[in-house]
């Protein structure tokens, strides 16, 4: 830079300093005067505000300024639809066939002809009822009569006569009669014991009398 440019820059900053000094002096001079004049007015205003009642909510909200850009002047309501930001619509996806190594399906289907079955006939080597349990003609039939555990000849020999049957019935009925309850058994025992005790008492008295006579 040349000497002239340096001097111009210095003069510029020096002039700015002079302006700032003059403004600060004016503020310093006006400061105490303004405070002195506003000092008596402030307590009066504060007293007036304290004496006044608080405004109602309706009045308070009416006095509050509302931004005009949020309202529609015709309907006096917020037009949210116009202000909503929507995402850009995606283009419709195109269907693409997957690449695979599978064999494509045939264009036409052909049904295979039915294979020839074996000629109809009975296989004598297999009993179908035993294998598949389908109760065919060759399946074993269930015995529906009374069970016979012995041959017919032995059963006839072991059958008792009619007299034996009657005697066995009588013996069974007698056994049923002889069945006693626990209380009956105890009573019978007490009776037997009392009889024996009386007999012993009599025999003891006889023995004592014999001794006295001797």
Swiss-Prot record:
Composition bias, Acidic residues: 152-165
Transmembrane parts of this sequence: none
Pfam families noted in UniProt: DUF4660
Feature: compositional bias, Basic and acidic residues: 49-61, 81-97, 179-192, 200-214
Low complexity: compositionally biased ranges: 32-44
Residues bearing PTM Phosphoserine: 162
Domain of life the protein comes from: Eukaryota
Renumbered residue ranges of the record's region Disordered: 1-66, 81-214
Keywords: Phosphoprotein
Family named by the database record: Belongs to the UPF0690 family.
UniProt name for this protein: UPF0690 protein C1orf52 homolog
Source organism of this protein record: Danio rerio
